[in-house]
């Protein structure tokens, strides 16, 4: 599993492109779910595929946070935002931090970048091993196949003052594979206008199958129909109290 070229090329513009995302609302909802379903008593939170650290920044006042991401570029930005926080480069299929957490999260459909079910099972096992007894796993999956709009197109504009970004996208589907084709126009003072293209490939896994994989990893699992993004839902899986 490689870090996406998009994150290497566009890490510096990532927060601008997602400026409309309500991280505060997302985080508040995640905390409510973690408190409702979690059975451990601590306050340690691991965010896998933490990106630039926006969720961790909001969790930090209440939790002792750690982040893992595959992208050096995204981690560099996260370190600027979160001085003193442990941020580790790692692959979600294989990392081992040597410690356990009360909450493990994998958000913003990062799990969808795993191309095979075997990879998904490996990642779920890694998540489970990092949970304390009674700890809770929160996974925001890629979109449920039944909600996917084939041929869907979008256009968004983002004004960062001296930097302006237009992003257009289209979606193609082949079996369980979703390809999201992005075109970026980046207008930046002193650098002119650049056009970048990138295709992101994500695997669709039916919610019922995600629950089965989490249970096979030894967790008690369910899929909530509403999550940080409603049509994606939220996998909630709890480790047994004694292991």
How would you describe each model-predicted region?
Residues 24-41:
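Conserved alpha-helix/loop element of class I SAM-dependent methyltransferases that forms part
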Residues 41-49:
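Conserved class I S-adenosyl-L-methionine
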Residues 46, 53-94:
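Class I SAM-dependent methyltransferase SAM/SAH-binding core
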Residues 93-103:
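A short acidic, Gly/Pro-enriched loop at the edge of an enzyme's catalytic core
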Residues 102-118:
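A short SAM/SAH-binding and catalytic strip from SAM-dependent methyltransferases
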Residues 121-133:
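A short glycine-rich, Lys/Arg-flanked "PGG" loop and its adjoining helix->strand segment in the class I
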Residues 138-209:
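SAM-dependent methyltransferase
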Residues 203-243:
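C-terminal lobe and adjacent flexible extensions of AdoMet/dcAdoMet transferase-like proteins
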């Amino acid at each position: 599993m490689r870090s996406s070229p998009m994150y290497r090329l566009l890490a510096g513009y990532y927060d601008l492109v997602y400026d409309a995302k309500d991280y505060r609302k997302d985080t508040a909802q995640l905390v409510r779910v973690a408190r409702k379903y979690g059975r451990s008593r601590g306050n340690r939170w691991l965010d896998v595929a933490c990106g630039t650290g926006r969720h961790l920044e909001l969790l930090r006042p209440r939790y002792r946070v750690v982040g893992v991401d595959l992208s050096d570029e995204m981690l560099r930005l996260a370190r600027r935002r979160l001085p003193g926080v442990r941020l580790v480069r790692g692959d979600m299929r294989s990392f081992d931090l040597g410690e356990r957490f009360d909450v493990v999260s994998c958000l913003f459909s990062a799990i969808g970048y795993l191309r095979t079910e075997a990879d998904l099972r490996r990642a779920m096992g890694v998540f489970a091993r990092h949970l304390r007894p009674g700890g809770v796993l929160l996974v925001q999956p890629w979109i449920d196949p039944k909600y996917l709009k084939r041929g869907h197109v979008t256009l968004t504009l983002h004004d960062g003052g001296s930097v302006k970004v237009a992003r257009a996208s289209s979606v193609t589907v082949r079996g369980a594979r979703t390809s999201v084709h992005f075109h970026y126009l980046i207008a930046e003072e002193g650098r002119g206008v650049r056009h970048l293209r990138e295709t992101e490939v994500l695997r669709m896994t039916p919610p019922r199958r995600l629950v089965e994989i989490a249970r096979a990893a030894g967790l008690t699992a369910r899929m909530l129909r509403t999550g940080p993004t409603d049509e994606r839902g939220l996998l909630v899986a709890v480790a047994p109290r004694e292991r």
